[in-house]
């Protein structure tokens, strides 16, 4: 500071509020303060404070405070069953795929059939995890790619077996016996 003292806590400098830890290091991101949780951008400028229980909107991002604590690095399920996930800064994930789940634009984990970017996916209705490999859904067998989670349409060889999926993704498995020979309709 101008007086030569170590800057600690919220300090006004040239009309802008900054936050410094006990070692005088300027902090950025979401910081718990005596007034609630205050967001400081990468330059240290104060962006606003949230402090009410439940949902809070700040700079276009949603945060959730429960029992006085902001939810971070966790999942949260509302009373109506919607599941949300918050990152390390407390920001609700939205409109992205993260750790095997799709998050809607509204932030909830999508379940069941999902159509994104021209491909079909399926997320388990209980865990919200996007399915991979062979799955039987409503009595129909499907195959979902292990790396990008997309439902197979067309054909692919997996573990020495030819998988054929029609335009709806319904799978037929063909065992390849040897070069030029195949057994259709069974494993």
Model segments located where?
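Extracellular adhesion/carbohydrate-binding repeat motifs centered on closely spaced tryptophans
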Residues: 1-187
